[in-house]
Regions:
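Glycine-/proline-rich flexible loop or hinge segments
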Residues: 35-40, 69-77
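Short polar catalytic/cofactor-binding loops
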Residues: 10-17
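Glycine-rich, proline-tolerant flexible connector loops at the mouths of alpha/beta enzymes
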Residues: 33-59, 108-115
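Acidic (Asp/Glu)-rich catalytic clusters
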Residues: 1, 21-28, 45-67, 90-100
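Short, contiguous strand/loop micro-motifs
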Residues: 6-8, 40-42, 78-80, 117-118
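Active-site acidic/histidine proton-transfer and metal-coordination neighborhood
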Residues: 16, 22, 59-61, 75-120
Length: 120
């Protein structure tokens, strides 16, 4: 029978990222998810060198990046701001691929029931 891997959002440890990865490893977890939309890990700040270092650190500790969180905190409800957030989301997708995952979690917002709504 397939055993589902268990992971954690590393920010939930409320520790520096390397310490959080070590905690996940100590708990025997398979995967980690981190935010790619805030702090030092937004793609604009998170250099290729630092990405490689963190990926290798995770691997050395026996965990993998199962997902990158691409949630900007408000969904994709505004046509005007979507111009910005869709472009930022593309950079999060690139970040996820560099961290060797193809899973990005996010919240798109509330989908209206009315299929004729502009937001639908």
């Amino acid at each position: 029978m397939y055993q589902f891997p268990i992971g954690v959002v590393v920010e939930s440890f409320r520790k520096e990222i390397h310490e959080a990865i070590q905690e996940a490893s100590k708990l025997g977890l398979d995967g980690i998810q981190m935010y790619g939309t805030r702090g030092d890990f937004v793609p604009e700040k998170f250099t290729a060198e630092r990405r490689r270092e963190l990926l290798n650190f995770a691997k050395d500790n026996g965990v993998k990046f199962s997902a990158i969180c691409g949630d900007f905190g408000h969904g994709f409800m505004s046509v005007e701001s979507n111009k910005i957030y869709v472009e930022r989301s593309k950079r999060v997708v690139d970040l996820a691929l560099e961290m060797e995952t193809n899973i990005i979690t996010t919240h798109i917002g509330v989908v209206p029931e009315d299929k004729t709504s502009e937001r639908y």
